[in-house]
């Protein structure tokens, strides 16, 4: 559960980043594929080259999902229910990959929003992304 102060930190940081969702989401995915090559197996049908339209489009989906989550702190389970079903039952994504992507998202935010990426914002965003990962893996059980 995020505190009110953490919600404010996430809202402020994600508010700045969300306007660059496609760019930041694509960069996070590219970092994911470079740092953790086994994650590419879920995207074998994608053009994984730098700047590909498919990576940008999926990056935007990731960013949009995070915007949805940030808009529903107290009802994230319902807000992300369909996405959780998709990843658990159709795509069958290994749950560890959400944590790996969360790490890459933090790196991208630190790179692009250094002034806003304070230690407290970092901690709040990490907690938020962990909550998102928990919600997305809740249907695996």
From Swiss-Prot:
Single GO cellular component term: haptoglobin-hemoglobin complex
Residue positions, PTM N6-acetyllysine: 16
Keyword Protein biosynthesis part of the UniProt annotation: no
Residues with the Phosphothreonine modification: 134, 137
SUPFAM superfamilies: Globin-like
Sequence positions bearing Phosphoserine: 49, 138
Reported tissue expression: Red blood cells.
Modified residue annotations for N6-succinyllysine: 7, 16, 40
GO molecular function (one): iron ion binding
Protein residues bound to heme b: 87
PROSITE patterns membership: GLOBIN
Alphabetized Pfam families for the sequence: Globin
Binding residues annotated for O2, in chain numbering: 58
Keywords, ordered alphabetically: Acetylation, Heme, Iron, Metal-binding, Oxygen transport, Phosphoprotein, Transport
UniProt entry tagged with the keyword Metal-binding: yes
One GO term (biological process): cellular oxidant detoxification
Positions where Phosphotyrosine occurs in the chain: 24
Stated role: Involved in oxygen transport from the lung to the various peripheral tissues.
Protein name: Hemoglobin subunit alpha
The species this protein was found in: Ornithorhynchus anatinus
GN (gene name): HBA
């Amino acid at each position: 559960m995020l505190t009110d102060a953490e919600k404010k930190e996430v809202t402020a940081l994600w508010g700045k980043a969300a306007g660059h969702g496609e760019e930041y989401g694509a960069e996070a995915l590219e970092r994911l594929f470079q740092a953790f090559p086994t994650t590419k197996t879920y995207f074998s049908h994608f053009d994984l080259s730098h700047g590909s339209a498919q990576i940008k489009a999926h990056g935007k989906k990731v960013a949009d999902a995070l915007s949805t989550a940030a808009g529903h702190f107290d009802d994230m389970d319902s807000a992300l229910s369909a996405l959780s079903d998709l990843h658990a039952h159709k795509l069958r994504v290994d749950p560890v990959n959400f944590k790996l992507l969360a790490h890459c998202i933090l790196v991208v935010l630190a790179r692009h929003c250094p002034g806003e990426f304070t230690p407290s914002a970092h901690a709040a965003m990490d907690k938020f992304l962990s909550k998102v990962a928990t919600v997305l893996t809740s249907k695996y059980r």
